[in-house]
Amino acid sequence: MSVQLSMSYSDNIDEKYMREAIKQAKKAYALDEVPIGCVIVHEGKIIGRGYNRRNTDKSTLAHAEITAIKKASKKIGDWRLEECTLYVTLEPCQMCAGAIVQARIPKVVMASMNPKAGCAGSIINILDIKEFNHQVEVVNGVLQEECSTMLKEFFKELRIKKKMSKTL
């Protein structure tokens, strides 16, 4: 399986659920967290939602994908999310990519690649390691511009806040 750009195939559905992931990312943004959001869909229904809360929860585990996977597993009563699709606003890190493989999620739809920490094609593709017993289809580029703009705005504001705090 490889990373592919989403152009026309199931665009409407992918955009619909990516917009839900963006809503989650905006919750993180409101908490001064890196704005990453995630939803997990099963049979046309969202069964798990999450957004980045690392600073708020003081936990390296409080990533959007991990939270959404926990909620989805609880909702369906199984750790295996074999008939689900995960939508996330930024390419998963190594921890989240590993959790996606472990949860047996067959498909991940991403908005933006993460050249500094991405493990679904940017640095490494954990989701497609043939030696694992499960590989994941990856679709990239759904609402990419909107998500990239939100991330850029967040980091621009963060730099301004840091600069202002140094001058006080």
What is the role of each PLM region?
Residues I36-G44:
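Short beta-strand scaffold segments in enzyme catalytic cores
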Residues S2-L31, W79, M95-L168:
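Zinc-dependent deaminase
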Residues R19, C38, K70:
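A cross-family signal for key residues in well-ordered alpha-helices
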Residues L61-A62, I66, K70-A103:
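Helix-adjacent hinge/juxtasegments
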Residues R53-T56:
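A short acidic/small-residue loop/turn micro-motif
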Residues D32-I36, E82:
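Short, basic and Ser/Thr-rich N-terminal targeting/leader segments
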Residues K16, K45, T67:
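Active-site phosphate/pyrophosphate-handling residues
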